[in-house]
Amino acid sequence: MKHIARKRFGQHFLTDGAMIEAIVDAIGPRPGQAMVEIGPGLAALTQPLVERLGQLTVIELDRDLAARLRAHPQLVVIESDVLKVDFAQVAQALTTTKLRVVGNLPYNISTPILFHLLNFIDVIEDQHFMLQKEVIDRMVAGPCTAAYGRLSVMLQWRYAMENVLLVPPESFEPPPRVNSAVVRMVPHVNPAAVDGHLLSELVQVAFSQRRKLLRHTLGQWLQQKGYADEFDVQRRAEEVPVAEYLALALKLATHSQAASH
């Protein structure tokens, strides 16, 4: 029975054989590696991946697709919403310390998935995701560009990232209205030891009104926190490099510790 793509899951299925091969080559799976695929769909990537790996764990929310995938002897199927999956437990079950994570992420929840995975970065070796190209542009953007924002800062803090492949709409069934691309994400070995919640709040405040100078947003927020050290708020959020946001978060944490003693 033919599976009909469900709009509520944001399903677009990859059907171009040459493109599938190029994506699998970019991922570079090797026999015995512990890999998890998010949203395998109709197994376009799953089949060539499992042929190279020998075994693959897949996370699929769609009940019909999960049932179909269970018939494959080399697949371990987790039927779940990926946002509820504990990747540390998955690594434990696979008796490994590091997972490779791949997937053609549903466009409507790609950002929440990326933030969810941040919680499990210690058990992740690398990530390869197909996403809307516009999302990847935001992930890898540098300061002083329109694409630079909260996503850029939060992800660049923890990952080295690159856009490795462009995937045109005609590679899919049904074709999406947007261009897609594949991003490679490799966790930094020694990221800045910043409090993630504090950084997230700081960056959210900074980018809450992109067009305004930071003194209207971040400046006031820093004042409320009783922080009076040097930080140039006579510029816009997009003009501040990642390293400066990290340095500010570190100083803020030290300041609030000192204030509470």
Curated annotation (Swiss-Prot):
Pfam families the UniProt entry points to: RrnaAD (PF00398)
EC number: 2.1.1.182
Domain of life of the organism encoding this protein: Bacteria
Gene3D superfamilies attached to this UniProt entry: Ribosomal RNA adenine dimethylase-like, domain 2 (1.10.8.100), Vaccinia Virus protein VP39 (3.40.50.150)
UniProt-annotated binding residues for S-adenosyl-L-methionine: H12, L14, G39, E60, D81, N104
Reaction catalysed by this enzyme: adenosine(1518)/adenosine(1519) in 16S rRNA + 4 S-adenosyl-L-methionine = N(6)-dimethyladenosine(1518)/N(6)-dimethyladenosine(1519) in 16S rRNA + 4 S-adenosyl-L-homocysteine + 4 H(+)
Entry-linked InterPro entries: KsgA/Erm, rRNA_Ade_diMease-like_C, rRNA_Ade_Mease_Trfase_CS, rRNA_Ade_methylase_Trfase_N, rRNA_adenine_dimethylase, SAM-dependent_MTases_sf
GO cellular component, one term: cytosol
UniProt xrefs under PROSITE patterns: RRNA_A_DIMETH, SAM_RNA_A_N6_MT
Record's subcellular location: Cytoplasm
Keyword terms, alphabetized: Cytoplasm, Methyltransferase, RNA-binding, rRNA processing, S-adenosyl-L-methionine, Transferase
Enzyme class of the recorded protein, top EC level: transferase
Protein purpose: Specifically dimethylates two adjacent adenosines (A1518 and A1519) in the loop of a conserved hairpin near the 3'-end of 16S rRNA in the 30S particle. May play a critical role in biogenesis of 30S subunits.
Family from the record: Belongs to the class I-like SAM-binding methyltransferase superfamily. rRNA adenine N(6)-methyltransferase family. RsmA subfamily.
Designated name of the protein: Ribosomal RNA small subunit methyltransferase A
Organism of this sequence: Albidiferax ferrireducens (strain ATCC BAA-621 / DSM 15236 / T118)
